[in-house]
């Protein structure tokens, strides 16, 4: 229900007072109090989480009234406040009791509380100081109890609930980081004395765009229903007082000779707006596109002083949407609705924004449907997603007035005439976020300090625009390319154009390729692009022509193709190059931008016409963190949510761990992760509400939701998107590696944990080569490295790199290293590297493909120690003597680690313990005795086979025992039950428990043959001596 609201200066946990009518309607006559949820209106879309409060009856309050402490909503009522709220009772007064409440305490206060001899005395302090009463007071996360002294950090398991001194754990945390020093109630520092009224006839003040539309319910005084809401501006009460005007009065906003009339309203507390700033809608901001500071002054003009225009001439502002015939009817219909629903106040040279639903264009709403109610019936289904502008060219008035520039458009008296098209630059993003204001799906906001490739594109577009303003022809063109799909090439172009205020003409070339291999396809494709752009560009400058998926129509000519196909391909390549030059030369200030996935497929003849090429990589860790923050922001989480419950995330979410674990994923994958986590949190929300019998005030996404969604995304899309996975092999799974482990920590752990030590120019060691007999754990060791240091893991096999086409094998090597750089920190593991990189000159393959692979591998390894932080290369081989000698030089595989056969009983014991740590061993098993029985030419793989055979022997022995028990049971009972039925109905846990005995190990050891003979072992030792001696 909607109730009148008054804020008091009482303590934060003072009971809220309610009038008798509310108490009688919702309260229990037997109960002494009532619990309910108070939700304040907000300046923006969606709804805010409500606060559960403890309410008491106050007979002195007027009808349908509530009094609430202002501190509960984090502000002091020094200015006009909101005077209504939404109240919902808690059914059956069931408010959950919290398990724990964490308080952040000032250092001095914390030390004094810790000096108290009993914990109960600390609870009594909170009780008397902040009026926290057991099983009565409702506390909320982030409540400020005292500015600079005490705040509630967290409530568990719900963000708000009752405190029970006998059950709720109260946790006091010392504020050692001085976070409380900057924590205050909003408006707390303001004096209660009013400022001097009318001290300035004009004020210089900041002008900013409203972030969203303001509900009429928040306008004080309430305006007339026919008032023009496109000229409403807002500011704080202090500014109104200094200007000596009341809320709802006309004022003038001026700068550099431009004067606009606005109706100024007060912003009610609480709100998140800045003080001494005037907030205006986009229509007013468009009149001051380059002015962040304006002069406001009191106006003596009333509504009756503004004349009504007889005729008004408006022209369309050039742009992509205005040039599309399919949108003309819906645009004109929306324009007509804009002028008919209110008496609009306009001025010559005004820009009028018109938002419309482009999906309604298919319904072909005609202009002549004046007397039809179809438009009103469809209005509830509108969801605006596009914006066009109109420009007021001139107006005809009957008479002169006090204000010669402004006039009113009366839908019953004024004739509106649309004329030609005019050119106007769009508003840059820094002046107005039009997508957020009108509720459109927002384009991701790139931080130019974190995304250098976006900064490069912005700089190119900005330079091109500035040069065209000075009459300098730059003819800029940019080719965006990437090695992975869905990295945001189109998004960055849309952002850059909005950020700078540049028209965008976007064409997806995939829609042009259905008949791209026919003889007349070239003329059709070129004709379509020319027709779409040439009609717009004369009235849309500066502009960006963006052709997405350009490689779908441009292909490099292959000599093996059909001659007709070659001719066709050369034709379209030539025509596209000519088109590029024509547009950039004929329309100064126009920048051509194309995007491709694989730049190697773009013909060199076309690439030579592109001035700039920008590589768009997979996001780095810092970039992924920013993307997670964007998609977990309030405006993104609550967009297109049908439910009324707001969605947010827990305060303890670690964005750094999310960004680290999501290495190699694209922005689209991160968006999918957040959507999956939101759905999981929503399902849990309704399940918990059914269990506890009440509906929490918000849906909270937890760290576990995001972690599970990230793991699911990596598992599902690892093959399709090429994202590597982190294996699950720990040091405990490997035995006898103490020396090798120490060497690995020095090589890998040091650069990861202390990168500052290598800033002086010292090169990192990024290459490790494991060599030794087969079965000694080289592959297992590489996986353990990736797991221990949380590194992504690429395993590369030799045959995967080979390709029948010339140059493709080396390209495969480049792709492997490129994927690793995109997924860093990462380990590239080359198993049996001697088959990939043998000595050059000794191979008999035609074409020398192996030699070229070795050369490419050497080139990639040379960059590992300098510009590839977090990428480590590990090779494994049984025959290091077959490797090309250049691989073993410093800067490449400069760390050679020999993984030999365990040659002592202790090492063999360590391996046995690692392999059997998950076994259930009998008391008679003595692993040290077993190790003494094993010869010293057993490899790690041999010990793995020994333990596996022992487990198999134990299972066979238990199977025979079970069969014997089943046979005895059938003889005693006369039944004929099967073994499966016996397990289902009669068997106990002891019958299914596999216990490995010493006899199982001894039997397995007798049957085991070593995989490495003594002679072979001597050969490997000789190779080791040769390498270590060298």
From Swiss-Prot:
The keyword Hydrolase applies. Keywords: ATP-binding, Cytoplasm, Hydrolase, Membrane, Nucleotide-binding, Peroxisome, Peroxisome biogenesis. It is an enzyme of class 3 (hydrolase). Its EC number is 3.6.4.-. Residues 767-956 are annotated as: AAA-cassette D2. It catalyses: ATP + H2O = ADP + phosphate + H(+). Signal peptide: none annotated. Gene3D superfamilies: 1.10.8.60, P-loop containing nucleotide triphosphate hydrolases. It holds the Pfam family AAA_lid_3. It is found in: Cytoplasm, Cytosol; Peroxisome membrane. One of its GO terms (molecular function) is protein transporter activity. Present with 1630 molecules/cell in log phase SD medium. AAA-cassette D1 is required for interaction with PEX1. ATP-binding in AAA-cassette D1 is required for attachment to PEX15. ATP-binding and hydrolysis in AAA-cassette D2 is required for release from PEX15 and proper function in PEX5 dislocation. Interacts with PEX1; forming the PEX1-PEX6 AAA ATPase complex, which is composed of a heterohexamer formed by a trimer of PEX1-PEX6 dimers. Interacts with PEX15; anchors PEX1-PEX6 heterooligomers to the peroxisomal membrane and mediates their association with the peroxisomal importomer. Interacts with UBP15. Belongs to the AAA ATPase family. This is Peroxisomal ATPase PEX6. It comes from Saccharomyces cerevisiae (strain ATCC 204508 / S288c). The gene is PEX6.
